[in-house]
């Protein structure tokens, strides 16, 4: 989450008048994340999250995101539920941006996940995949393999300004993955951005999953690979196989991976690392002036990519033989 667009108190009060959720008592921007502008809104009825969809978000995708949250919540997954206005509309506009109000989930995100957190996360991810199996809408993953070269181009020759040799490293990996990306794996709704700041815990148990604005239709095992990258590396860049084993065991307790998915996991993990390396690189080079946002270090994902390049099989991630 982040804040790119400011909202004036009077604007927000007028916006809230279209909802049956009480009157405004306080609000503040949320700095975490990179994509949209988010505010924690307190009213006389409770707490809510207001999201303003920024220019990088395609308005045509918003019904997918909103519909998915409604679908998953209806199937028992703990995730934000869109709040309808009195008119029945879920999408509205404020400060010149499309906007939606969603329910606030209790719990806290963890900055240093334990193996127990990883096991909980694995189970929750598999439950999300099963709950989304009958979701009728589809959305292509525009940040999968076909979208990586345009991101590299968007870095506009500046990769080596971030680290010498980075451009060549990205170019080589991109060529390898474009030529060898897995095909025909089980697919469905994926979260695609399930980092620790998008999962909430209460008493060490997963209490909710948030921020579905990268969700799309893609290989389910790619979502697992994203989570291995996001949850199972230590601050020094080393892979924690105990956390990986916990995450994978938790996932497979709910939805066992197929043989093809297991075989593809190292390549999928490389792809996930390259995806976040590229998007972080572009964001690092293009932070809007005055935005309340913390750009994330792209080189963290270069280190992770180097690890994945040396992996022989899914067993190296902790997957049971």
Curated annotation (Swiss-Prot):
Superkingdom to which the source organism belongs: Bacteria
Pfam families hit by this protein: APH
Keywords: Amino-acid biosynthesis, ATP-binding, Kinase, Nucleotide-binding, Threonine biosynthesis, Transferase
EC number: 2.7.1.39
Record bears the keyword ATP-binding: yes
SUPFAM superfamilies for the chain: Protein kinase-like (PK-like)
CDD domains the record matches: HomoserineK_II (cd05153)
GO biological process: threonine biosynthetic process
Pathway participation: Amino-acid biosynthesis; L-threonine biosynthesis; L-threonine from L-aspartate: step 4/5
Extent of the signal sequence: none
Disulfide bonds: none
Catalytic activity: L-homoserine + ATP = O-phospho-L-homoserine + ADP + H(+)
Gene Ontology MF, one: homoserine kinase activity
HAMAP family: Homoser_kinase_2
The family this protein is said to belong to: Belongs to the pseudomonas-type ThrB family.
Protein name: Homoserine kinase
Species this protein is from: Xanthobacter autotrophicus (strain ATCC BAA-1158 / Py2)
């Amino acid at each position: 989450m982040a804040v790119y667009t400011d909202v004036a108190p009077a604007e927000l009060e007028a916006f809230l008048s279209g909802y049956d959720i009480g009157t405004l008592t306080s609000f503040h921007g949320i700095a975490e994340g990179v994509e949209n502008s988010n505010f924690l809104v307190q009213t006389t009825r409770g707490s809510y999250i207001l999201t303003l969809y920024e220019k990088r978000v395609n308005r045509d995708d918003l019904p997918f995101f909103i519909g998915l949250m409604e679908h998953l919540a209806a199937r028992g997954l703990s995730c934000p539920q869109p709040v309808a206005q009195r008119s029945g509309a879920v999408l509205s506009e404020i400060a010149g941006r499309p906007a939606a109000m969603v329910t606030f989930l209790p719990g806290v995100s963890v900055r240093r996940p334990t193996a127990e957190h990883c096991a909980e996360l694995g189970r929750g991810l598999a439950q999300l995949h099963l709950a989304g199996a009958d979701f009728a809408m589809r959305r292509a993953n525009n940040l999968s393999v076909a979208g990586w070269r345009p991101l590299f181009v968007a870095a506009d020759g500046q990769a080596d300004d971030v680290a010498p040799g980075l451009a060549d490293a990205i170019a080589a990996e991109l060529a390898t993955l474009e030529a060898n990306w897995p095909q025909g794996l089980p697919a469905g709704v994926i979260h695609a951005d399930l980092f620790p700041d998008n999962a909430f815990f209460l008493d060490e148990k997963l209490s909710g999953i948030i921020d579905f604005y990268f969700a799309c239709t893609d290989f389910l095992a790619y979502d697992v690979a994203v989570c291995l990258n996001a949850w199972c590396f230590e601050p020094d860049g080393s892979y924690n196989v105990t956390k990986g084993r916990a995450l994978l065991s938790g996932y497979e307790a709910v939805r066992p991976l197929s043989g093809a998915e297991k075989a593809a996991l190292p390549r999928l993990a490389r792809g996930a690392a390259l995806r976040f390396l590229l998007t972080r690189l572009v964001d690092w080079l293009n932070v809007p002036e005055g935005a309340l946002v913390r750009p994330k270090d792209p080189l963290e994902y270069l280190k992770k990519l180097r690890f994945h390049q040396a992996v022989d099989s899914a067993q190296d991630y902790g997957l049971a033989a």
